[in-house]
Regions:
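Phosphate-binding glycine-rich loops of NTP-binding sites
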Residues: 58-61, 306-340, 784-793, 838, ...
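C-terminal lobe/lid and adjacent interdomain/linker elements of RecA-like ASCE P-loop ATPase modules
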Residues: 347-350, 370-374, 396-405, 816-918
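Extended, charged alpha-helical "arm/stalk" segments used for dimerization and assembly
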Residues: 363-447
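Pre-NBD coupling/linker segments of ABC/ABC-like ATPases
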Residues: 220-221, 243-290, 697-698, 703, ...
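Extended, charged coiled-coil "arm/hinge" scaffolds of SMC/Rad50-like chromosome-maintenance ATPases
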Residues: 444, 448, 452, 459-777, ...
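Charged catalytic cores and adjacent phosphate/nucleic-acid-binding surfaces used
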Residues: 1-49, 53-55, 67-89, 94-115, ...
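Conserved ABC ATPase signature
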Residues: 304-308, 312-319, 380, 766-790, ...
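Flexible phosphate/Mg2+-sensing switch loops adjacent to catalytic phosphate-binding sites
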Residues: 331-369, 640, 644, 648-668, ...
């Protein structure tokens, strides 16, 4: 039969370590206990009261144990408690002779012989002396040191505690002299019961508890207990309560060995509050894991996990790292593979094996599903040390930035700057498109203008025709007055024709606008609705909150629709006026043609005149087209120049934003982490990518120095203070050079080159310094320690962290003085699952759970059924079982730690020697 019962290890449970039974002379309403059945009935009521109160352990400590061994109720209570999982520790309360009769408790192992306990009690009184006189409990004639010696010689496992230390007959009942101080400092008394939680103590007792009283300063575990004299809740009398009404939360197995842990960890293993301590959100802790394997290679039973510190130990190649990596891969395979790649370790080939992770809220992740629903930090073996290698520095920077972003104020400022940079990049992309659109339009206008002909040649031809027409007019005998009239009418006709064409264009444009605006308005209104819907979904608004948002947007839409209605009405009126204007301009042309006709009729050679008129009309139209294109070309060139300037401004803005990011990354408020550790950041330019992307556009058999003085030997000499100048100067060179002279590689165009030039090649590189020493110049051990401190101790992340052998390259002294301290602090807020070979990380960090792994290699028959098997429990789980069916089941966690971990036995011994409990 397996002795592994509490697989999840040390958990918080309620303990009442000072309880009495009706054998106590002060018991209220003593029930009948004469017969066996009456004792059993009371024991059942006693246990029911304890379990209803949520107790996991009670210590029955009746005064002087009992007057008659046969009347003892402890066996009956233990018998009733066992099926319900309630542990009953036997013990007694006795008044030792020190300081006028100080009460102490002695608590024994649940496996202790009650007969031997009774014999111990007998030795505390002179032979033949009674323990009671009527209802009076008699004090022992022995002092506390004599009590300790008698207990030591009994061979029993025991703990001595000061009973109700701050009350009458307690060790701290009154401020005393050297004798009371000496009594309080007895090294073999490691527990003191108080009437109230330590934080509520006042006066002298508070000075003792807080360690400010020099005469009473010592390490001791404090507990509170009921000191019950009844099973029924009522008015506490003399600081006594009903069973379970006052108790202590203790983080340990519900066993005597579990109780011993509060001696070693007096501050971290006890707690005084109503609800269970150290409760983490259930979606942030893993409840259990299991291999889904039908091949017989891995055990199929689930492995429960403690929500605090879980350590995985075992010999070489026993499946420790396999278990850890399977957890990581089932939760986030991509992250696990990326971390493993950095660490340069190999992932175990799982073949068809599946793996399941169940979270405390009931969620399940499976390796086969490859769906990321939860977060976890995975630090495989050597990952921390590989991070500082040159090739992995981007990953280090990413990790350090993630750490900084856990600060809410930093994150808000960071997001603001990133949004600004993104806005600049969006605007830059738009401006580049606008720039090339203008360039295309300019080329189109130039081409069309050239197709119409040469402007100077057309103007010369018009002058020649005008001279010929003038000769015809003179030959027709026009008077000076007719000549002047003729010229005026001709000039007016030219103006009227120009006005008519303008009126036609404006009217046509207005009709186009009127036809297309309604669709644009409807599209805009629809997009506004889309924005509202996206904002509602993104922020998870409730219906009432959504209505508030919509009420504001409705007003905007109504304003747009009202403005559109006014615009439609105004433009309708305007079109009527424009139509009238076009008709008037047409009539003016007709009028001037009519006025000109009499003069034209007088010219003798009408055929030649008509030819001149037709040529003049055609050439004037062509010239007007050329002038229009020239005007359009000038406008495009102005916009083109403005676009280039806008691009240059955006390049400058982008650089300024990056500078502000670097300033944020170096702000002491966020980067001074304590312990003289400082995170710093420098601006970086991705030179290799720039040369590959941008310079790769060109035929580099020719020098790229024409792009500027910073381009030498087909490479770039980058300096942060020159960044904007380098990019903008190269841009000017590109766009001013005829495209056929750029020597672009086949398939490349000017647009490609500009796009690649204007990409964002700016980045940042983080580093860490301690007392001015850069992490990249530290020893591997110091590098690992600092990064572990950042990622584990200083991080605000609450999701689980999985670490494989963090002790690599770190000496034992540093592990104990630093790494253990980090882990102890963080395990309270964050589940830590850690593979280790170092006993200090198991015992020093006070691991709540130890998982022992074993591989049955080469058919040795060490395992019960599978090639890879695991057992788990708390470090207080201690036993040997030579009849067990496997190596793992043959001993407890303590024994496995001593066997598997080098120095494990010494670590246990030092832990206990510290408290004189060896």
């Amino acid at each position: 039969m397996s002795d592994y019962i509490h697989h999840r290890g040390s958990e918080w449970r309620k303990w009442d370590l000072h309880a009495h039974t009706p054998l106590d002379t002060e018991w209220i309403s003593r029930p009948p206990l004469r017969t066996e059945s009456e004792r059993k009935l009371f024991a059942e009521q006693y246990v029911k009261t304890a379990t209803t109160a949520g107790l996991a352990v009670i210590a029955i400590t009746d005064h002087n144990f009992c007057s008659n061994r046969d009347e003892l109720l402890i066996p009956y209570v233990q018998q009733a408690a066992t099926p319900l999982g309630l542990t009953v520790l036997p013990g007694f309360e006795v008044a030792v002779s020190d300081c006028g009769g100080t009460h102490v408790l002695v608590i024994f192992s649940e496996l202790s012989s009650l007969d031997i306990i009774d014999e111990v009690m007998s030795q505390l009184f002179p032979p033949g002396t009674a323990r009671f006189q009527g209802k009076e409990v008699l004090p022992s004639a022995r002092g506390i040191e004599e009590l300790h010696e008698i207990l030591r010689q009994s061979g029993l496992s025991y703990l001595i505690a000061f009973a109700h230390a701050d009350r009458e007959n307690g060790a701290l009942d009154q401020r005393g002299g050297a004798l009371r101080s000496r009594l309080w400092k007895q090294p073999f008394v490691r527990i003191a019961q108080l009437s109230k939680p330590p934080s509520e103590c006042t006066g002298f007792v508070a000075s003792v508890v807080n360690g400010t009283s020099s005469h009473y300063s010592r390490d001791i575990a404090y507990v509170i207990a009921s000191d019950c004299r009844s099973l029924e809740p009522g008015t506490p009398a003399q600081e006594r309560y009903s069973l379970g009404e006052r108790c202590t939360w203790i983080k340990a197995d519900p066993t005597f060995e579990g109780l011993r842990q509060i001696v070693f960890e007096p501050n971290d293993r006890t707690c005084f509050q109503e609800h269970k301590p150290e409760e983490k959100p259930p979606f942030l802790t893993i409840d259990q894991v299991r291999f889904l394997d039908s091949s017989g290679k891995f055990q199929r039973d689930p492995i429960p996990l403690n929500p605090n510190l879980v350590t995985i130990i075992g010999g070489k190649s026993t499946g420790k790292s396999i278990l850890l990596s399977c957890i990581a891969r089932a939760i986030d395979a991509e992250q696990a593979e990326a971390a493993t790649e950095i660490a340069k370790t190999n992932l175990y080939d799982l073949g068809t094996l599946d793996f399941e992770v169940m979270w405390s809220n009931g969620d399940v992740d499976r390796l086969s599903e490859n769906e990321v629903r939860h977060r976890v930090t995975f630090l495989p073996q050597m990952y921390i040390h590989r991070l500082v290698e040159q090739e992995n520095r981007p990953s280090l920077s990413e990790s350090l930035l993630s750490f900084l972003r856990q600060n809410g104020t930093f994150e808000a400022r960071y997001r603001k700057l990133i949004n600004e940079r993104d806005a600049v990049m969006t605007e830059l992309a738009t401006e580049i498109s606008n720039f090339f659109s203008l360039l295309s339009s300019w080329r189109d206008v130039v081409t069309k203008s050239k197709e119409l002909g040469d402007k100077s040649s057309i103007e010369a031809e018009l002058n020649r025709i005008a001279e010929k027409s003038e000769e015809l007019r003179k030959a027709s005998g026009f008077t000076d007055e007719e000549t002047e009239q003729y010229r005026k009418i001709q000039q007016s006709l030219l103006s009227a024709n120009a006005g008519f064409r303008t009126a036609q264009r404006v009217e046509a444009s207005m009709r186009t606008v009127v036809a297309e605006v309604p669709a644009v308005i409807q599209d805009t209104l629809a997009k506004i609705d889309d924005v509202v819907a996206e904002a509602t979904d993104f922020h998870g608004l409730e219906e009432t909150e959504t209505q508030q948002l919509r009420s504001h947007v409705v007003k905007l839409k109504q304003a747009i629709e009202a403005a559109n209605a006014i615009f439609a009405e105004d433009t309708s009126k305007r079109i009527v006026k424009l139509t009238d204007g076009t008709k008037a301009a047409s009539k003016a042309v007709e009028a001037f043609n009519s006025a000109l006709k009499p003069f034209l009729d007088k010219i003798a050679n009408q055929k030649e005149l008509r030819e001149h008129q037709e040529s003049t009309k055609q050439l004037s139209s062509v010239l007007e087209g050329i002038n229009g294109y020239e005007k359009e070309k000038t406008q495009i060139e102005q916009k083109y120049g403005a676009s280039v300037e806008a691009v240059e401004r955006l390049v400058s803005d982008r650089f300024a934003t990056q500078e502000r990011l670097i300033e944020l990354f170096n702000e002491p408020t966020y980067t001074n982490l304590g312990d003289d550790i400082v995170i710093s950041a420098d601006m970086m330019f991705e030179k290799d990518r720039f040369e590959s992307d941008f310079l790769g556009c060109f035929d580099l058999r020719h020098s790229a120095s024409w792009l500027g003085s910073h381009f030498r030997d087909n490479s770039i000499a980058w300096h942060p203070e020159e960044h904007v100048k380098i990019i903008t100067s190269a841009l000017r060179k590109l766009i001013e050079m005829p495209e056929d002279k750029l020597r672009l590689r086949a398939g490349q165009k000017l647009r490609n080159a500009v796009d690649l030039l204007l990409r964002d090649y700016l980045s940042h590189s983080f580093s860490v310094k301690q007392t001015g020493e850069d992490i990249f110049r530290m020893s591997p051990g110091k590098q690992g320690l600092i990064l572990l401190e950042i990622f584990l101790h200083l991080s605000n992340s609450a999701y689980p962290v999985l670490i494989d052998q963090p002790e690599d390259n770190i000496d034992n002294r540093t592990i104990y003085s630093h790494l253990v301290r980090y882990i102890r602090r963080r395990k309270v807020d964050r589940q830590i699952i850690m593979v280790t070979h170092n006993p200090n990380l198991v015992l020093g960090a006070d691991a709540e759970q130890v998982i022992v792994a074993n591989q049955d290699g080469e058919g040795k028959g060490e395992n019960a059924e599978y090639r890879f098997e695991y057992v788990s429990g708390g470090i207080e789980c201690s036993f040997t079982n030579s009849q067990a069916g496997s190596l793992l089941q043959s001993k407890g966690i303590r024994e496995h730690v001593c066997h598997v971990l080098e120095g494990g036995e010494d670590a246990f011994r030092k832990r206990e020697e510290k408290y004189c409990l060896t």
